[in-house]
């Protein structure tokens, strides 16, 4: 009602916006629609409106019939579709909707996130030949430019490369607390957990550097595990090399979500530092037990 733009994900949200528009006929409301269609990556996303459904058509027709609601843009966002072919399908899919439903006055088209960013060499080898930002631009902006070449109104093209940009610059530092052997398999216990690293450690072997504190022993096929009681708390699988208790482990390329994904489980969250002018500056303090228990209400009863 105060000039913001509302991005609609589902029918319930749309109906609510229609009610608000009806109650405020003098207020002009701009909305965007998050759409959902297949880009061939094998993931059925739960987000957005199915662009092949009658519900989607009904939403478009309803917007056209309400004087104080304007469709300002289309939004598409999907996970695990970083390859160029998926990006080509998403931009062509969006432009097909523009053409099919004559959406000639859109102010923006948002293609969401999901690009490859700069990667450490260890990750680069696992992902193979990854596209550059220029590769994405040629595919996406190229299709947009050709489609809108002879059209009057040209929408703004948005992408959302958040983690794409920052992933390479987030590192987590941990320490080896113990090394144990179970039926011939070695495990190195760290003072961090997979929650500090993010889901990347379950998908790929994250880049890892070890600072040896003292002369260690050469191990084969060691799993680096976290301090939680969860079997899936594995940070790195299959390390071979020198290792000793007290060694410092640097886990690289851990992404942007790792700084917020850590639940208050077993240990409070770790602090965060940024490097500036060759100095470390704390920009997020260590979480305390008081922080964790602050939302809880403890009622004391007299015995």
Enumerate the predicted regions with their spans.
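Active-site-proximal beta-alpha core segment in soluble small-molecule metabolic enzymes
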Residues: 1-108, 117, 148
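General structural feature for long, well-ordered alpha-helical segments within catalytic domains
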Residues: 13-16, 55-59, 70, 86, ...
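Conserved beta-strand segments that form the floor/walls of ligand-binding pockets within enzyme
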Residues: 32-34, 75, 110, 158, ...
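Glycine-rich beta-alpha junction loops
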Residues: 35-39, 78-82, 113-117, 163-165, ...
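Short glycine/threonine-rich loop-to-helix capping motif typified by GTGT followed
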Residues: 83-90, 119-134, 167-175, 236-239
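Acidic, glycine-rich loop-and-beta core segments that form the ion-binding/anion-interacting portion
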Residues: 91-158
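Charged (often Lys/Glu-rich) extended helix/loop segments that serve as interaction or gating elements
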Residues: 152-303
């Amino acid at each position: 009602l105060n000039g913001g733009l509302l991005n609609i994900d589902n029918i319930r949200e749309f109906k609510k916006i229609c009610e608000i528009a009806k109650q405020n006929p003098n207020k002009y409301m701009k909305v965007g629609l998050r759409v959902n269609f297949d880009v061939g990556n094998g993931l059925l996303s739960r987000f957005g409106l199915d662009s092949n459904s009658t519900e989607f058509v009904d939403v478009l027709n309803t917007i056209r019939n309400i004087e104080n609601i304007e469709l300002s843009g289309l939004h598409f966002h999907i996970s695990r579709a970083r390859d160029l072919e998926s990006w080509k399908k998403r931009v062509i899919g969006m432009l097909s909707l523009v053409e099919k439903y004559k959406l000639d006055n859109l102010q923006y088209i948002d293609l969401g996130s999901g690009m490859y960013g700069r990667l450490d060499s260890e990750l680069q080898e696992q992902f193979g030949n990854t596209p550059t930002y220029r590769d994405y631009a040629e595919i996406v902006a190229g299709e947009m430019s050709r489609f809108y070449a002879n059209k009057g109104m040209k929408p703004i093209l948005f992408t959302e490369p958040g983690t794409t940009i920052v992933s390479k610059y987030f590192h987590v530092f941990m320490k080896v607390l113990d090394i144990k052997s179970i039926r011939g398999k070695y495990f190195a216990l760290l003072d961090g957990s997979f929650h500090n690293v993010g889901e990347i450690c379950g998908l790929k072997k994250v880049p890892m550097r070890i600072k040896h504190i003292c002369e260690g022993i050469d191990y084969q096929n060691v799993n680096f595990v976290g301090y939680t009681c969860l079997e899936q708390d594995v940070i790195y699988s299959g390390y071979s090399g020198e290792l000793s208790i007290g060694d410092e482990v640097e886990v690289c390329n851990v992404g942007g979500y790792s700084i917020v994904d850590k639940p208050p489980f077993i240990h409070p969250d770790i602090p965060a530092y940024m490097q500036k002018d060759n100095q470390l500056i704390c920009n997020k303090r260590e979480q305390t037990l008081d922080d964790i228990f602050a939302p809880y209400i403890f009622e004391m009863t007299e015995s």
